[in-house]
């Protein structure tokens, strides 16, 4: 910023092209173990060098400066560098498939699946080895947070493929300009990856680890970056999966995102539709069955959160009539399915919950559930181009 450079949140699609892209640590899996060897890069990236050349190059007298500056940009574009900044990268409802904070990789889908693998290894290996001698066991609670939510920022990246639109800050010149919708197969693959990450197997904290997560020790306190709890001072075993699951659902069912899906489907019959998206979520959350009681309890939390997110989407005053109509249909299909499913243990509760909501959507108060701990701390109303997040 001191040199006058803005964030380039599309730089990470071309390696580590800019330190102004908040690159996430690169974590590799080698022989079944997590490797930190390439976690951080050293020095400037390709886009940073382009920024310096464009801003501070001095040309001999008589040089066509405009031509030389344009050639710097054209050369950078041909090398695969892109520039997309704050206003297109920060909003959860953003559409740009390449502009994200704290992400890695040319493929958001591949990196999301990779981070889930890294996370699985980290959770299996997480133990009191993460403590110094003399530290309270309760410190593990906070040290678990970044491991459990390891993929939260990559989730913000992959979800922008759904209803995604690729564009640039193009100007008229020799470089072709075109706005394109993210391919239907890519959108469907992104949805599949996100739905898979909502399974109870992925959301469950390993049972052996739960035995090492006591209430906060005397002299210590929970912070805004700690797990939230609805079980008093005792670690909320179901609260962590509930908050993560709800957070991912809110990303997927963002009002702006589903509005774009409806428009994209209208222009291209092969595109992913809002109906298809909702059907995949419903199938995963309401139709998947578990024998394990721990997984059943997590699934019940997901059902509650899914209904609440759908209710919020339908009642949102800023959504279009099409969003309201389709979300209404989704809710009714869930209700009808519940009426037929006599094996659902909370059947009467869910049916009554839906009935009360549909009677008066605007007046319905959604039940509170634990929210995600605060994550990215960077940015205020004053800095980063006046965008809040």
Tell me the role of every PLM-derived stretch.
Residues 7-9, 24:
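Short, flexible loop/turn elements at secondary-structure junctions
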Residues 1-7:
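Active-site recognition of the HExxH zinc-binding catalytic motif
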Residues 14-389:
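Conserved catalytic/binding loops enriched for acidic/polar residues
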């Amino acid at each position: 910023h001191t040199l006058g450079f803005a964030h380039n949140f599309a730089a990470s699609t071309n390696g580590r092209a800019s330190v102004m892209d908040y690159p996430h640590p690169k974590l590799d899996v080698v022989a079944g173990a997590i490797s930190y060897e390439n976690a951080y890069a050293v020095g400037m990236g390709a886009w940073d060098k382009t920024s310096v050349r464009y801003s501070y190059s001095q040309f001999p007298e008589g040089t066509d400066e405009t031509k030389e500056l344009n050639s710097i940009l054209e050369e950078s574009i041909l090398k695969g560098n892109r520039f997309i900044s704050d206003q297109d990268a920060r909003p959860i409802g953003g559409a740009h498939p390449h502009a994200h904070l704290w992400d890695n990789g040319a493929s958001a889908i591949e990196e999301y699946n990779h981070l889930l693998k890294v996370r699985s290894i980290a959770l299996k290996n997480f133990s009191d080895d993460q403590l110094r001698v003399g530290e309270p066991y309760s410190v593990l609670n906070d040290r678990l947070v970044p491991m459990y939510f390891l993929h939260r920022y990559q989730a913000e990246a992959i979800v922008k493929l759904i209803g995604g639109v690729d564009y640039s800050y193009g100007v008229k010149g020799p470089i072709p300009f075109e706005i394109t919708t993210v391919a239907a197969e890519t959108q469907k693959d992104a949805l599949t990856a996100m739905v898979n990450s909502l399974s109870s197997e992925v959301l469950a904290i390993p049972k052996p680890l739960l035995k090492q997560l006591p209430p906060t020790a005397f002299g210590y306190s929970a912070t805004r970056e700690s797990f939230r709890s609805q079980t008093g001072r005792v670690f909320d075993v179901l609260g962590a999966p509930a908050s993560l699951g709800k957070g991912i659902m809110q990303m997927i069912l963002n009002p702006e995102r589903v509005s774009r899906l409806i428009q994209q489907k209208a222009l291209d019959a092969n595109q992913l539709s809002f109906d298809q998206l909702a059907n995949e979520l419903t199938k995963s959350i309401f139709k998947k069955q578990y024998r394990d009681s721990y997984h059943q309890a997590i699934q019940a939390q997901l059902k509650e959160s899914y209904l609440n997110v759908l209710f919020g989407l339908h009642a949102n005053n800023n959504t279009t009539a099409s969003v309201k109509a389709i979300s209404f249909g989704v809710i009714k299909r869930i209700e009808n399915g519940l009426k037929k499913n006599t094996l659902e243990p909370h059947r009467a509760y869910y049916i009554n919950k839906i009935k009360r909501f549909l009677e008066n959507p605007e007046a319905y108060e959604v039940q509170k559930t634990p929210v995600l701990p605060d994550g990215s701390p960077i940015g205020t109303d004053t800095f980063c181009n006046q965008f809040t997040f």
